[in-house]
Amino acid sequence: MTPPLLASSAAFALTSPDRILTFGVEPDRQPPVGNGIVRVLMIEARWAIYIADDLRRAGHALDGVRKEVGLKRADLADPESRIAYAAYVGLIERAALLLADPAYGLKLGASHDVRDNGLIGFLALNSPTLNDALANVERYVAVTNEGIDAVFERAGQGFALRFRETDASLRGLRHIRSRPLPRWSQAPAN
């Protein structure tokens, strides 16, 4: 018998135009490929703590939501601790539903300063130029967030930092896709 995906039997679905992701239910297990080891992508708990704070301020009980996405109370105690990236995605998408805010991911990113990003924020703020800051984010983002890839693109005098979920099944979810954008718009501009 395979262990349950999450501690809770409650389920909710995250939708995007081309798929439905369901958390909290027994998944259809496929035979292992290769050695059968599955790598769980991790992220610092920092942004999950910000989301939990938003839910508390709005009067939502956190225990049920935490269990639905597979998080324990201790997972949200230290911003430097690591949680599963899929649980973080579940939390931000669930928060958007509970807060009835279709732009929650965007607002979450815009409501925090670059300094609220821990190591990545420190690197960005201590880079001599915006170009250097974005290059450093591309280089080091996986240290704090294994769930996204960053690509720094240069075109003439312009440049952009593009994020993409490492796990293809999570790509395109609305709130996770929009959160990183505004938080880097405040990086050093010289």
Give residue spans per PLM region:
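Core beta-strand-centered patch of the WYL/Sm-like small regulatory domain
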Residues: 170-190
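Conserved short histidine dyad/triad with adjacent acidic residue
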Residues: 164-168
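N-terminal low-complexity or simple alpha-helical regulatory segments
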Residues: 3-162, 176, 180-183
